[in-house]
């Protein structure tokens, strides 16, 4: 899980979602998981 000020999809499998008010990226590649904050 990377924590970044700005989250962007890194590949075609990345999805930007909102969970509990946080913007997150979920992906089939675990290296691409990101969270804002």
Curated annotation (Swiss-Prot):
It holds the Pfam family Ribosomal_L36. HAMAP family: Ribosomal_bL36. It comes from Ligilactobacillus salivarius (strain UCC118) (Lactobacillus salivarius). Keywords: Ribonucleoprotein, Ribosomal protein. This is Large ribosomal subunit protein bL36. GO terms for cellular component: cytoplasm; ribonucleoprotein complex; ribosome. The keyword Acyltransferase does not apply. One of its GO terms (biological process) is translation. NCBIfam families: rpmJ_bact. GO terms for molecular function: structural constituent of ribosome. Belongs to the bacterial ribosomal protein bL36 family. Signal peptide: none annotated.
